[in-house]
């Protein structure tokens, strides 16, 4: 692949053996050797490919018009003949804008030049000494159930200045939204406040981190007080918890959230530390289980403008699906669980150095690809991440080590000479797959993947049926989500998470939730259009759909061995 932008890390010795100095100078790298610390924009060099991959930074065309503006003003010295107040001097130059009382309380301006920071052409947010009109920064944040990602954006140019990410600190209260809602319910005195504080603390820490490592020529290091707008995309539960609004109603029938409309408030109101008067814009949701992250993704992928049949799937803990039937949007949410993100797995871990990310079962043994290592090895890893658990389950089914119903075969059912025999292990009556000397894949691990598979595939079929469409009518399947981008088509098809008919129709769109937050930061029009999109998206409650339980049970079955490729 060719690196178009971003830091792909140090060139390895293996790459130097296979690539010429001219190719390396052009930014050409071996994709299997690259372990970036930040998002990359890449160009694939294969002439033939079965799945198109759009870069993590894919952004559709949009009208840049930020709601935060800067204007240079001059405060003149007053005297006995000219006693014009500072407030009036500001209004004369800025026009009919609101000047908050909190700003007047601390207004001590000497004669000189200042930079006024104005929100939505109607309210003065801050006054900066000198000419700061070349500098304006914001942050776009994606709050997922499992991870939180923050990007620092130069709002003058639209350039991403840096990123920070971490595991959602709310994991101590539960790995999924329902467990966290249960925590709030069980702790009525302070549960809601605890859930809010851990996420706002994380955001403040990430803003500190990304500012600390970002310097601008002529200005120096960016500080948190330079950030004047923060936009957030998140699922509906995470948005409630961020804003300190009770999410209890989301956890019980009829699953009615406290709010779904966008929210625009001062960041300081919920404890987020940024510039004076900094705004916090939270994107709109559709329902309790189709949140702002999905609205953002649908907007980024321009689903309302499609002139064909497109299925959009955000693969994460919640597993949301949107079907665009020539612009008509139908949606549903399926409880995929955190298995595909490496959680709820006996040896699971996040995608980090030391994690197994790919697995091959061969007659010579189990071959592992481990993040941070250069090629397939049999060295001892730390655990298995989401793409790794999906790969191993695919291989277990391909080699017949698990049946179509997901159960491990019995060691007594195969010959001791069979290359697979030493890979199976009995722990009492429990059967396990021996992946390494230390790590095992249990029946429970397989079941976690199976439940995710059943949830996503059944939602896929249910939406098609609701729209009156067949598999043949489907033109494109877009895979979104920070984790979805790392799940190869071979594993998605091989485990039956997606039907084999769509293998050549897949497009990976990366973290479209964060991209949507970015668009909202850079364009007031994008905010308005997302709000319109959310209003027009239809939601289907799978649990209330006739025949869904039977459909879900059918979708739990794995594909036939003959249908799975290596």
Q: Where would I find each of the regions flagged by the language model?
A:
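Nucleotide/phosphate-binding catalytic cleft detector across ATP-hydrolyzing
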Residues: 16-140, 145, 157, 191, ...
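Glycine-rich phosphate-binding loop of actin/hexokinase-like ATP-binding domains
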Residues: 144-145, 150-178, 249-262, 296, ...
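Catalytic P-loop NTP-binding/switch module of NTPases
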Residues: 56-62, 161-162, 350, 367-386, ...
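A contiguous, well-structured pocket-lining segment that forms one wall/lid of small-molecule binding clefts
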Residues: 397-467
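Glycine-rich phosphate-binding/hydrolytic loop that grips phosphoryl groups
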Residues: 285-300, 450-454, 505-541
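A glycine-rich phosphate-binding loop feature that marks nucleotide/adenosyl-phosphate handling sites
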Residues: 226-236, 315-317, 409-419, 473-483, ...
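Short glycine/threonine-rich loop-to-helix capping motif typified by GTGT followed
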Residues: 234-249, 469-472, 481-501, 542-551
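N-terminal phosphate-binding loop and adjacent alpha-helix
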Residues: 169-213, 344, 355-360, 448-451, ...
